């Protein structure tokens, strides 16, 4: 009988990837606005291309921020600060086409149709939260490793350890799964990184394997059959926005769960917390993570849907993929008893009117151990256990 080997793959990209540059600029603008006006409404979008950054979208605020300077500072911080990169902080043209938020949308959000004391959802739509006990940070191993590879290559570049590296990079990790869908081994690693013209491909591959990949991968999951693809296309000198255009919201799977869970389609960066695309997705992750950490299931996905101008969710669904340790009706009861999914309740519970967003715009919004994010807190575990 033929038995098909099962695999799962996730990817991540560096802070210097064109789409991530756009995300970071959008969230840097949002943070600057929130620092002056915590009640600002923001839906900022950014495009990046050869020598150009375009900023547009909607913003309603009493704050004044220098959008052009924020964009230039963000680009420089990422590492685009040398003329040979083509796209640089000092040479880029920044255009600002931000307009004020529609009054129709504003009035729908300011006072919910079903509860005037609450904020209405900023739009219709559904969001998903997910957690798995596969890793200590409750993310799929493939995504956790892909993010770590991107942070590691940033670190060796910024430290000057590999001074020929340039900011644009991508990583992808594939694992083999056993009959119980548990990770049995790492099957393949793909890592592509931009570099100077001076380095040979052989030298780059040797250095990246030794200083970037090997320190990150769990050695107990690596074997003689693990395949490494390091710059498999060969030369990668021209990169970043000089080679590819970038846009906010095009890395939503990298930002969330690496393909292990559903996605409602709404992106995060540039949006303030009245946008349930962002705030409710964060809260859904918070709920899922606390439920899994409390032991109700090995992995759990939560879907929440909203109507524009209405506070209470239209629907809430919980999926445990056959891993529940208690009755699923009990899980739903616990969730309803402990967690309030109305937008204003979410904003207040997670304290989301603060300038905390730029730090999330690269290397993932979830499972972060390098920064302190309120939706990653495990402060509801004891309450959940008491109700189990």
UniProtKB/Swiss-Prot annotation:
UniProt xrefs under SUPFAM superfamilies: S-adenosylmethionine synthetase
Pathways per UniProt: Amino-acid biosynthesis; S-adenosyl-L-methionine biosynthesis; S-adenosyl-L-methionine from L-methionine: step 1/1
Documented EC number(s): 2.5.1.6
Binding site for Mg(2+): 11
Binding site for L-methionine: 58, 101, 244, 275
Binding site for ATP: 17, 168-170, 233-236, 244, 250-251, 267, 271, 275
Record bears the keyword Zinc-finger: no
GO molecular function, a single term: metal ion binding
UniProt-listed Gene3D superfamilies: 3.30.300.10
Cofactor note: Binds 2 divalent ions per subunit. The metal ions interact primarily with the substrate. Can utilize magnesium, manganese or cobalt (in vitro).
Subunit structure and binding partners: Homotetramer.
NCBIfam families: metK (TIGR01034)
HAMAP family, A to Z: S_AdoMet_synth1 (MF_00086)
Family: Belongs to the AdoMet synthase family.
Name assigned to this protein: S-adenosylmethionine synthase 1
Source species: Pinus contorta (Shore pine)
Organism lineage string: Eukaryota, Viridiplantae, Streptophyta, Embryophyta, Tracheophyta
């Amino acid at each position: 009988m033929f038995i098909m080997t099962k695999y799962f793959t996730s990817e991540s990209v560096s802070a210097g990837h064109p789409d991530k540059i756009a995300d970071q600029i959008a969230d840097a603008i949002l943070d600057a606005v929130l620092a002056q006006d915590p009640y600002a409404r923001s839906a900022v979008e950014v495009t990046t291309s050869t020598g150009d950054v375009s900023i547009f979208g909607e913003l309603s605020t009493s704050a004044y921020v220098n959008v052009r300077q924020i964009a230039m500072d963000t680009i420089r911080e990422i590492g685009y600060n040398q003329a040979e990169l083509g796209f640089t902080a000092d040479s880029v043209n920044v255009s600002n086409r931000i307009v004020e938020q529609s009054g129709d949308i504003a009035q729908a959000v300011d006072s919910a149709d079903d509860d005037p004391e609450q904020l209405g959802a900023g739009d219709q739509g559904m969001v998903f939260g997910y957690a798995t006990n596969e890793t200590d940070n409750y993310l799929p191993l493939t995504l956790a490793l892909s993010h770590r590879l991107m942070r590691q290559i940033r670190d060796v570049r910024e430290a000057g350890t590999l001074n020929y590296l340039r900011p644009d990079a991508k990583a992808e990790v594939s694992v083999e799964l056993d009959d119980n869908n548990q990770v049995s081994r790492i099957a393949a690693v793909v890592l592509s990184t931009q570099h100077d013209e001076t380095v040979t491909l052989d030298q780059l591959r040797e250095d990246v394997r030794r200083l970037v990949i090997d320190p990150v991968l769990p050695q107990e999951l690596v074997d003689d059959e693990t395949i490494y693809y390091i710059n498999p296309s060969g030369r990668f000198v021209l990169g970043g926005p000089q080679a590819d255009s970038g846009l906010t919201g095009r890395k939503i799977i990298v930002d969330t769960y690496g393909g292990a869970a559903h996605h409602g389609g709404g992106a995060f960066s540039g949006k303030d917390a009245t946008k349930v695309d962002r705030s409710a997705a964060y809260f859904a992750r918070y709920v899922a993570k606390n439920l899994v950490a409390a032991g109700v299931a090995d992995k759990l996905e939560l879907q929440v849907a909203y109507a524009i101008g209405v506070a209470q969710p239209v629907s809430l669904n919980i999926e445990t993929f056959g891993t529940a340790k208690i009755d699923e009706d009990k899980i739903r009861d616990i969730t309803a008893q402990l967690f309030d999914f109305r937008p204003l309740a979410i904003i207040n519970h997670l304290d989301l009117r603060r300038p905390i967003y730029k730090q999330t715009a690269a290397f993932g919004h979830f499972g972060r151990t390098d920064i302190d994010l309120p939706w990653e807190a495990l402060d509801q575990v004891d309450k959940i256990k008491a109700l189990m």
